[in-house]
Regions:
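A domain-level signal for the structural core that forms small-molecule/cofactor-binding pockets
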Residues: 1-63
Length: 63
């Protein structure tokens, strides 16, 4: 069974619902499996807990 983990900044429930549906459909078509076989985990990280290039994400918006 495919297990997908998505690490991202927080998104709305509606956005996650739509993405989960699209990812599931892609696996159903590509692997010919049932939708129930696909598991998706959303790991949301706030901008205070995420850095890139040595800078926190909260500081990216200030530049």
């Amino acid at each position: 069974m495919p297990i997908v983990t998505i690490q991202q900044s927080p998104r709305s429930v509606e956005m996650k619902r739509e993405l989960a549906h699209k990812i599931t459909e892609a696996f159903v078509q590509a692997y010919e499996i049932s939708p129930e076989a696909v598991q998706i985990f959303f790991a949301e990280t706030s901008h205070e807990n995420w850095a890139k290039g040595g800078e926190l994400a909260v500081d990216w918006k200030k530049q």
